[in-house]
């Protein structure tokens, strides 16, 4: 059963947690934003390239859901990256309704150069936490995200 009421202390703790989380997210995100701008991409374009580089070819719908983008934004970003030669779209031979995006040789070569530096900058951003603390934070953030997502559909 879903809780419908919270006492004042619980509400204040939740609001404090939200503010701390939002500030931390913004601070860490700035590292990625700086990297994307440094290489001539907007943050969404950089996120798409990073996803394809680290996870391989993706259905366009998967890109949207993984990066929390609406389909129009996905199409716009994919179009731009394709025009610039970083990725291509291909129809799934097994399901003609599905279209995959994958990096071109140019895209892979470019990410081979810039991704290691980007990953080190993100690692540095989290280096204030021990490896155990980072693992704990991953578990807690996943738990909070799943619970929050579940509440949206009640």
UniProtKB/Swiss-Prot annotation:
Q: Which GO terms describe its biological process?
A: regulation of DNA-templated transcription; response to stress
Describe the location of the HTH marR-type domain by residue ranges: 14-146
Report whether Transcription regulation shows up as a keyword of the record.
yes
One Pfam entry name: MarR
Q: Which residues bind DNA?
A: 60-83
- Supply the SUPFAM superfamilies for this chain: Winged helix' DNA-binding domain
Mind telling me which InterPro entries this protein's record contains?
HTH_MarR-typ (IPR000835), MarR/SlyA-like (IPR039422), Tscrpt_reg_MarR-type_CS (IPR023187), WH-like_DNA-bd_sf (IPR036388), WH_DNA-bd_sf (IPR036390)
Keywords assigned = DNA-binding, Transcription, Transcription regulation
Q: Per its UniProt entry, which superkingdom is the organism in?
A: Bacteria
Quote one Gene Ontology molecular function term.
DNA-binding transcription factor activity
Q: What is this protein called?
A: Uncharacterized HTH-type transcriptional regulator YkoM
Instruction: Please give the organism.
Output: Bacillus subtilis (strain 168)
């Amino acid at each position: 059963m879903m809780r419908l009421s919270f006492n004042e202390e619980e509400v204040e703790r939740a609001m404090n947690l939200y503010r701390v989380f939002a500030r931390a997210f913004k601070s860490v995100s700035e590292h990625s934003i700086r990297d994307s701008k440094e290489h001539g991409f907007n943050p969404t374009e950089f996120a798409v390239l990073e996803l394809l580089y680290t996870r391989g070819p993706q259905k366009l719908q998967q890109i949207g859901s993984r990066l929390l983008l609406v389909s129009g934004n996905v199409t716009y970003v994919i179009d731009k990256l394709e025009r610039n030669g970083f990725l291509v779209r291909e129809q799934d031979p097994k399901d003609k309704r599905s279209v995959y995006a994958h990096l071109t040789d140019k895209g892979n070569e470019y990410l081979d150069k810039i991704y290691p530096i980007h990953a080190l900058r993100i690692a540095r951003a989290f280096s204030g936490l021990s490896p155990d603390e980072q693992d704990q934070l991953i578990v807690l953030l996943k738990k909070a995200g799943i619970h929050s997502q579940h509440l949206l559909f009640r």
